[in-house]
Amino acid sequence: MPNTLQDRFFTTCDAALRTLFVTPHAERACPTLPGEATALTDAEKVQSGALMRVNHVGEVCAQALYTAQAFATKNEALRAHFTKASADETNHLAWTQQRLDELGARPSLLNPLWYGAAFGLGLLAGRLGDPISLGFVVETENQVEAHLESHLSLLPANDHASRAIVAQMKDDEVRHALDAQKAGAVPLPPPVKSLMTAAAKVMTTVAHRI
């Protein structure tokens, strides 16, 4: 675990480059439903591709958030917590990338922008103190959980592959929120939650198309 500021800086840069320019590799097998084949029409592939692109962007942002928060905290135990959560999100990043490839869809062209914006938010949250930083995690994961739940109703009913991935991601986000609460998160003020919701809406709307 890097301890010096210089070590953390280079680790943070490495994480950004890997997220944006290197094909991610999952440590956990991609979720699937045994015996459930996925046969989609062209229109359904387009629909699923757009939704999974949004989910992929969400995982790019998750990498940025956790990396920034790990960089900002001075608490070694909390840094390890953020690093572990980031590793979980790497699985999600790999799964969504794999599914995009299978659907013949591309990731968002604006991923560097999304990463930079999310990193800035994570760094700001981290500078405000560990309890607030953890509260930011709780609210983010709660919003992501709700977003993934909505995608389960929007994905084609017979897109079993995408649905299995989204369902597992949703379960993992619930666990991340609970872990952050146990680590000492404080609730964020309602105006902050509203701003986060508005920012997420912009991201999901744009990423659905670009």
Swiss-Prot record:
Question: Could you say which cofactors this protein requires?
Answer: Fe cation
UniProt topology in membrane: Peripheral membrane protein
Any idea of its EC number?
Answer: 1.14.99.60
Name of one Pfam family that matches: COQ7
**Keyword DNA damage in record:** no
Q: List where in the cell it is found.
A: Cell membrane
| Pathway participation | Cofactor biosynthesis; ubiquinone biosynthesis
Alphabetical keyword list: Cell membrane, Iron, Membrane, Metal-binding, Monooxygenase, Oxidoreductase, Ubiquinone biosynthesis
Q: Which domain of life is it from?
A: Bacteria
Q: How is the cofactor bound?
A: Binds 2 iron ions per subunit.
User: What does it do?
Assistant: Catalyzes the hydroxylation of 2-nonaprenyl-3-methyl-6-methoxy-1,4-benzoquinol during ubiquinone biosynthesis.
UniProt record similarity statement: Belongs to the COQ7 family.
**Could you identify this protein by its name?**
3-demethoxyubiquinol 3-hydroxylase
What is the organism field in this record? Albidiferax ferrireducens (strain ATCC BAA-621 / DSM 15236 / T118)
